Structures are given as C-alpha cells and as structure tokens.
Amino acid sequence: MVPAILKMKNALISTITLNPSLDQHLTVDGLVVDGPNRWSRLHRYAGGKGIDVSRAIHEMGGRTIAYGFIGGAVGRAVEIFLDEEGVPFSFTPIRGETRINFIITDSRTNHQTRIDAPGPRISKDEFARFQRKMQRIRPSPDLIVVGGSAPPGIPNNVYYTIIREAKKYGVRTILDADGQWLADGVKAKPYLIKPNVREAEELLGRELPDEMAIIKAARDIVGMGVEIAVISRGKDGIIAATKDTVLKAVPPEVKAKSAVGAGDCTIAGLALKLGAREPLTRACRLAVALGAAAVLTPGTELARRADVEELLPQIKVRNITSQLKKAISTTKTS
C-alpha cells in the first residue's frame, strides 16, 4: 500500500530555469593537478535548479512542466534527456547555445569540483518572447518554482518581476536563488524561499552560528513579507517558519555519496505538498526525505522514489514554536 504522504494530488507545479545546462559528471581515480587525468565514468543529465525540481517531481509521480530558455545542439540534448525521462517542458528557443557544466568527482577522496559556464547571452527580443509565454501559461499552475543563476542579458530584477507577475494571476511562487538574485526576489514577497545557512547569512548580513540563530533568521525572513521561510542545514535537516509556527525536520543518518541536487529535491518535496495546499508538516517531511534520498545517489543523480519511501518513516518533524517563545521570553527577562 502506498503511504498517504506519497499519494500525489493533482497540483501542477511549473518550474522556471533561466539558465539550463547539460551537466557532465566525470569520475576520476585520483585527480592530478598539472598532470594528465583520465575519467573512468561519464554521466550526462539535463541540469539547472528548476529542471532538477521538475525531474524530482516527475520521479515522485507529480505533475510538472519545465520552462526556460534553450538553444543549439546542447539545448536539443537537454530536451532529449528530459524526453527520455518523461518530464514535460515548454522552453523558449534562443540563438545562443545552452551551457555545459562539469562536475568532477575524485573517487579516492570523494571530493567534487564544479565548473559552471555563465550561459548564453539572452537578447531583449528573446526575453520579451519568454515573458509573453509566461503570461499565457496554460494550464495555469498551482505553484511556480523559480531559481538558479540567470544568463547574461537578463535584467537584474528578473526574479522580482516574475514573482510580481505571478501574484497578479494569484499564483504562489517558490524562490530558490542566492546572492543578489535572492535579495532582489525577496522584495517581491514570494510565497516561500529556501536558502541554506550561508545564503541566509548573506541575505540578512549576519552570522548564524547555532540553531537558535537560524530559527530567529527564519522568523526575520518571514518578517520581510515571505509567507514561509525554510533554511536548509545539510545533514541537520531544515528549519521552516511562518508567522505563527516554527518546525524542525531532521533526516536519519545516511551514507552520503553526493550532495549535488539535494537542495533541489528538497524544494520538490515542498512544492509537491504545498502546491496541493497540504499542511506544512507534511511538506517538510517529504522535503527532508527527498533531500536525504538525493545524497544516496552518485554524481548529479537525483532522489529515487524507492529511497524516499524507505526514508519517510524515519524523518522526525517537531513543532518548536514554544521553544522559540520561551527563548525569547528568557532573553527579555535576563
């Protein structure tokens, strides 16, 4: 019998990847600097934050469509990989060539090195065509996930614009970006953001040395107009805050093979449940299970449904709102 939490409701999640990629993951047996290297394994995948989220949603049996820019022979390869997985997409064609990213894993040390391309330059006409497509999305999504880097030629406030435009049509947005892209996007007050600790520190301009600091940071982000702030903490799980509630979700210990894609899988879990307007507790449980399942897979592979099913009963979700209120009260009286 399928657990109730894995029964996906009919919500449609659209993802936007402004800078898709063809990810090439190479494994070498001892990376040599200033010397010859020979890879032992090569895997190729369609990449980019939104695309990863769509792939993970599809793996879990959810409904999704991936949007973004695509171009050239590399772009066609990305579409072929998505076709083979059965992931629906509706990209805006461009003259430039979709980028190629390289991930190099040293099998001796298990260290990973990423080499990311900036991406093709997007013309004003190409961006205008993309905007028109977004205004005519059919069927209308229940939730839009947007994130990752933006290629050259894209306006600096692009995420702000996308989020504001979605709000006009009553569509909620999840923003998963960093740096200036995140800082600008937050000003449009998206439904949810999911920075990691480093990204949250950069957004708020302060260090977050412990759990209580992270909890307060999540509440401060909610105070900026975001409905749900989720801060991911790697193997320690996530902290999720709304104006009334703070949740802590923790995965079991797992033998990690690769952390690549874990954050995107976490977003997929949140989107699947919140897109269907299910409780935040269930969304956090599935999100952490998907994130933990992703680190069990090698290279840039994402979570497998079978691993998610095995991990779900082991995910602990606690309401720590009272703990926060007590800490604040103690601080005020001391």
What are the residue ranges of the model-derived segments?
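Surface-exposed amphipathic alpha-helices with a cationic face
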Residues: 58, 160-167, 219-222
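Structural motif
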Residues: 12-14, 113, 142-143, 228
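Conserved N-terminal subdomain of the carbohydrate kinase-like
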Residues: 35, 58-142, 310-334
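Conserved beta-alpha-beta core of the PfkB/ribokinase-like small-molecule kinase fold
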Residues: 143-214
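Conserved phosphate-binding/catalytic region of the ribokinase-like
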Residues: 168, 183, 211-334
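Glycine-rich phosphate/adenosyl-contacting loop at the front of the ribokinase-like
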Residues: 2-67, 75-77, 255-256, 321-334
